């Protein structure tokens, strides 16, 4: 691995499309991942050479990695809920599942929806925090009013 500046994006999972068109992907992320099924999908010699050159010249830190059975299961179930499962290829599912797996490794399921249209753990936490703040606010305002009223009553005596 070469010394590259941090990009702000830790991990980027590659699909075949940017490699087929030889998009400028170097410098977009700190680390790049690609499922073996996507590498196998690269039948175009230019796309394979492009990926090889990016990696061997140190332009990208690349790891060929599989998503794991649990991540693949979660993505497949979610894709069935959205109705997308029938149109996703095996490499598509592997890209999504690897993205899911990397997110879970880095941050847990905190930022991931479990159901279509559902809220993330982060959103649920924020809603609870705001509700607690809203409930506590009238009580604290009532205490302030009582203190102010008490001060006026004493001043009048």
Segments the model singles out, each with a brief description of its role:
Residues 2-157:
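Active-site-proximal, substrate-binding regions of enzyme catalytic domains
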